[in-house]
Amino acid sequence: MNSNDKKKVVRSWIEQFVHDFVEQLSKPTKDSVNVALKRRKHNSWNGSLDSKANERQKVKVFSFPRNETTIAQLFRVLDCVHEAVISDTVITKRDIYYRDVDLFKRQTVVDELLGDISNTIGCSRSDLNVEASAKGLVFGSIHIALENGTVITATKPLLISHHRISSITSTAKWVLVIEKEAVFQTLTEEALADTIIVTAKGFPDLMTRKFLVKLAKALPDAKFFGIFDWDPHGLCIYSCFKYGSNAYSHEPHSQLRNLQLLGPLYEDIFNKNQEFSLKLNKRDIKMITTLLQFEGFQKEPVVREQLQRMLFIQKKAEIQAILEFPSWIKGKLADADKSGKHSVR
């Protein structure tokens, strides 16, 4: 099903949904009118790690007039989506929120309703013509052509746009996915040849993940490496980039499966800078246990080894534990260039 067909499905679903609701209201014998959405229970901290999360969908029923505020919020969101689909314009979640702040009260209300709507229809959020507000940054030798005819470059850190991309061109050999913005900014000051740098400033948003997938398709010969804190949270973020998130299980095209962990690894830190390590807490240990059970990591021996080492020594460390970080990066990329492999030890 192409993009236009998906938009037709979304439009038809919304119109039928509204029609059914109005029809129920017109029946004088009914004391209340019900609407239903498919909602998900998902673990908010482990991203894609709970393999059973996608199976725990449930239907949430809202009754009018008992849940009149929620229903009003739902129909306001549907109105915005319907307008965006008909006019073929892309709006952001924040646009919807600011159209009726008094009604929504919180941005998360809009986020949850959009997730439930797309989950109920069985489409992605982009099929609703709604994107998250820009969060991620990209830097490097890259030209991005938008569908509106604009061509943008990233010779300075560029906010990843929600506008539709028609093509991406670059001669880069490497794409570095960085967990932290501070580390990203440090690398923009270095002369890293043939390299594109991307950060989502922590846990990745959907827009940044989808941009990376488009980048991977545009640059099939480039190698994608991830740089994350040597702790369970960092590897959880790596997992979300590579395997996706339960919160957007209906967004199958946001998994960067060719992403490989560059580091830092145990030997990068503890052979030199043990004083920069921190002790694991109970939450860290619980996360490590979950990560070791995660299906995606069963075929990643390097990642499993790092997690096991964390448990064994009861320590963790941040990227900043690498004192000569720019030199370390250049050395890792040089090793990858010599080996011609997609993983570096």
From Swiss-Prot:
This is Meiotic recombination protein rec12. Its main location: cytoplasm. The gene is rec12. Disulfide bonds: none annotated. One of its GO terms (molecular function) is DNA end binding. Component of the DSB catalytic core (DSBC) complex, composed of at least rec12, rec6 and rec14. The complex interacts with mde2. Mg(2+) binds at E179, D229. It is found in: Cytoplasm; Nucleus. GO terms for cellular component: cytoplasm; nuclear chromosome; nucleus; site of double-strand break. Its cofactor is Mg(2+). The active site is at Y98. It holds the Pfam family TP6A_N. GO terms for biological process: homologous chromosome orientation in meiotic metaphase I; meiotic DNA double-strand break formation; meiotic DNA double-strand break processing; reciprocal meiotic recombination. Keywords: Chromosome partition, Cytoplasm, DNA-binding, Isomerase, Magnesium, Meiosis, Metal-binding, Nucleus, Topoisomerase. Its EC number is 5.6.2.2. The keyword Nucleus applies. It catalyses: ATP-dependent breakage, passage and rejoining of double-stranded DNA. It comes from Schizosaccharomyces pombe (strain 972 / ATCC 24843) (Fission yeast). Required for formation of the double-strand breaks (DSBs) that initiate meiotic recombination. Required for crossover recombination and chiasmatic segregation of chromosomes during meiosis I. Also involved in the faithful equational segregation of chromosomes during meiosis II. CDD domains: TOPRIM_TopoIIB_SPO (cd00223). The keyword Flavoprotein does not apply. It comes from the Eukaryota. Residues 5-137 form the Topo IIA-type catalytic domain.
